[in-house]
Amino acid sequence: MNNIKRISLMTAIFLTVALVSSAVEAGVIRINGTIAGSESYAPFPNPAEGFYVNGSFTSTDTQLGPFTLFYSAPVDFAFLGTPPETAGASRLVVGDAANGDSILTCDLGNNPGSCANGDLHIVETNTIVGGTGRYAGARGSFTLDRCLNFDTGETSGTISGTIVVRGR
C-alpha cells in the first residue's frame, strides 16, 4: 500500500510541475479547415527518375487564422502509388500566420490511390519542428488530405491537427 501512495504522490508532483511550467503563454491551437492551391513541376536531370514540386496552399477557416503554406519537394517515381504510411516525399514547409510568424514542418506524403473524380489522392503527415516569432519552439502535427489534378497543378482538400505553443 505504501508503494501505491508513494507512486501517486510522485505522479501528482510530476503533473503539477509539468502543468505549471508550461501554463505561461502556452497553448494548443487546433487546425481544422480546407485548403486550396497549386503546384508546378520540374523533372530531375538525367536519368529522370522523378521530379521536383513547388507549390502553395491558402486557408482561412481554422483557429490558426489565415495562412499560406509554401513547399518544395523531390518526388521519386519509385514511391508513386505506394500504400498508406509509406514515405512518398519529404519537405520543409513554412506556414505564414496572419502576423507573419512562421511554422516549420517536416512532411512525409503518400499516394494511396485516386480521388472520386480521378485526380491523385495525396495524404501528408506534417511534424512541426519549430517556428519563428510566437511559434518559436512549437511542436505538434497536422495532416493534409487532398486531391491533385496533375495536368493543371490545382489541388484542394482538408487540413487537421494541432500546434502546441510553449511558454517562454
Language-model region placement:
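Beta-strand-enriched cores of mature, soluble protein domains
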Residues: 25-168
